[in-house]
Amino acid sequence: MPNWGGGAKCGACDKTVYHAEEIQCNGRSFHKTCFHCMACRKALDSTTVAAHESEIYCKVCYGRKYGPKGIGFGQGAGCLSTDTGEHLGLQFQQSPKPARAATTSNPSKFSAKFGESEKCPRCGKSVYAAEKVMGGGKPWHKTCFPCAICGKSLESTNVTDKDGELYCKVCYAKNFGPTGIGFGGLTHQVEKKE
């Protein structure tokens, strides 16, 4: 049957896509409402989409499903995730959780409830709500929140912590990340033996 006045077929729902509602990706057309990650169903756009053959994914799910696997292949230095990848068909074995200590009081909750503020780890002074920035699970002053090595201003998206200090991702990777061939951290020349 001819397709009179219609558009291409949607790569997700296989219904006709008209020009006003069309998003093109990898040579295929999609409705704006059908342009979602095939694994986590997150809405996509041109900056967040990653295509694999006829499938579309967000960059995170694409990396988990088709990216390199193993130690040293993560989302960057200091990034941890609790996602097991089950929605991608990946298997995960979790080690048993250690027993929790039986404590009944939390001094930081007590302090916050009765007006005493928490202390900044860098300067030791009180941190009030108007100047509070969270990093490494602790409150910091905005002025006490630069990278400990390069002094670059940090945000929640580029901060990593180690031993109570804050670092930008670049300094963290250079100083605490994996080293050797393939990691960009080769510190000495390898001699060729004949």
From Swiss-Prot:
Residues 10-61, 120-171 form the LIM zinc-binding domain. GO terms for biological process: blood vessel remodeling; cardiac muscle contraction; cardiac muscle hypertrophy; cardiac muscle tissue development; cardiac myofibril assembly; detection of muscle stretch; glucose homeostasis; heart development. It comes from the Eukaryota. One of its GO terms (molecular function) is identical protein binding. Its main location: nucleus. Keywords: Actin-binding, Cytoplasm, Cytoskeleton, Developmental protein, Differentiation, LIM domain, Metal-binding, Myogenesis, Nucleus, Phosphoprotein, Repeat, Transcription, Transcription regulation, Zinc. Residues 94-105 are annotated as: Interaction with CLF2. InterPro entries: Znf_LIM. A motif (Nuclear localization signal) lies at residues 64-69. It holds the Pfam family LIM. One of its GO terms (cellular component) is cytoskeleton. Disulfide bonds: none annotated. The modification Phosphoserine is found at S95, S111, S153. The keyword Nucleus applies. Positive regulator of myogenesis. Acts as a cofactor for myogenic bHLH transcription factors such as MYOD1, and probably MYOG and MYF6. Enhances the DNA-binding activity of the MYOD1:TCF3 isoform E47 complex and may promote formation of a functional MYOD1:TCF3 isoform E47:MEF2A complex involved in myogenesis. Plays a crucial and specific role in the organization of cytosolic structures in cardiomyocytes. Could play a role in mechanical stretch sensing. May be a scaffold protein that promotes the assembly of interacting proteins at Z-line structures. This is Cysteine and glycine-rich protein 3. It comes from Rattus norvegicus. The lineage of its organism: Eukaryota, Metazoa, Chordata, Craniata, Vertebrata. The gene is Csrp3.
